[in-house]
Amino acid sequence: MRNIKLIIEYDGTAYCGWQVQPNGRTVQEALEEALASMLGGKTALHGSGRTDAGVHARGMVACFQTDKGMPLRAFREGLNCLLPADIAVREACEVPLEFHPRFDALAKHYRYTMLLDDLRSPLSRLTAWRLKGKLDVDAMRSACAAFVGEHDFAAFRASNCAAKTTVRRIYSMDLVQEGPFLHLDVKGSGFLKNMVRIITGTLIEVGQGKKSVEDVARLLKGSDRQQNSGMTVPPQGLCLMQVYYPE
């Protein structure tokens, strides 16, 4: 038996998230259908985590096990021939049988992209959230520093989040300006449901002068989503960039 690790890129616009569910088309479902067609039978695919409806990925990691002796290049090219245009396997490699993409992950890097422009951009509408008006980016950067470290992120999760613990560690959080685009890059041990989107919404309110760095610190000391943390920004600006594993 072989354990095949895939690095997957996808445009999440048309999907109800990563994980298979009864109420809509998902990325995992499309990949498992392609695997079944290529390998001649149902094959379970295990991902490094979930992304919500409309969220994208450049570096989702997933694994499947097979006894097929195909070369690795054939797995990648075969799947890409069967997958729709909005999903692609970027890499395929063989890993030890005990490797699990979720449980062995050390950290994840997410990026949220904002378009700071009073005029709408048709070409960016599916990969960035447009904001009108100016933001105090320096104040937002100061607030980013408050999130770094281990904190209880209960105030920065969806109301229906079912995680057993809300403590997470953020390794780095940076804002990168690229022309009219402002990217929030967050690297952490793991993330609660909607956590990055709520953090982004909170930082935007700091940039608009509606919240202060002290407000952010106070929210991190609380344990209730009802504390008036920031809005949950739309999903299209969010992208899973990379998942990190031990060398």
UniProtKB/Swiss-Prot annotation:
It is an enzyme of class 5 (isomerase). It catalyses: uridine(38/39/40) in tRNA = pseudouridine(38/39/40) in tRNA. Coiled coil: none annotated. Keywords: Isomerase, tRNA processing. Substrate binds at Y110. The keyword tRNA processing applies. Its EC number is 5.4.99.12. It holds the Pfam family PseudoU_synth_1. The active site is at D52. Gene3D superfamilies: Pseudouridine synthase I, catalytic domain, C-terminal subdomain, Pseudouridine synthase I, catalytic domain, N-terminal subdomain. GO terms for molecular function: RNA binding; tRNA pseudouridine(38-40) synthase activity. CDD domains: PseudoU_synth_EcTruA. InterPro entries: PsdUridine_synth_cat_dom_sf (IPR020103), PsdUridine_synth_TruA (IPR001406), PsdUridine_synth_TruA_a/b_dom (IPR020097), PsdUridine_synth_TruA_C (IPR020095), TruA/RsuA/RluB/E/F_N (IPR020094). GO terms for biological process: tRNA pseudouridine synthesis. It comes from the Bacteria. Homodimer. Formation of pseudouridine at positions 38, 39 and 40 in the anticodon stem and loop of transfer RNAs. Belongs to the tRNA pseudouridine synthase TruA family. NCBIfam families: hisT_truA (TIGR00071). This is tRNA pseudouridine synthase A.
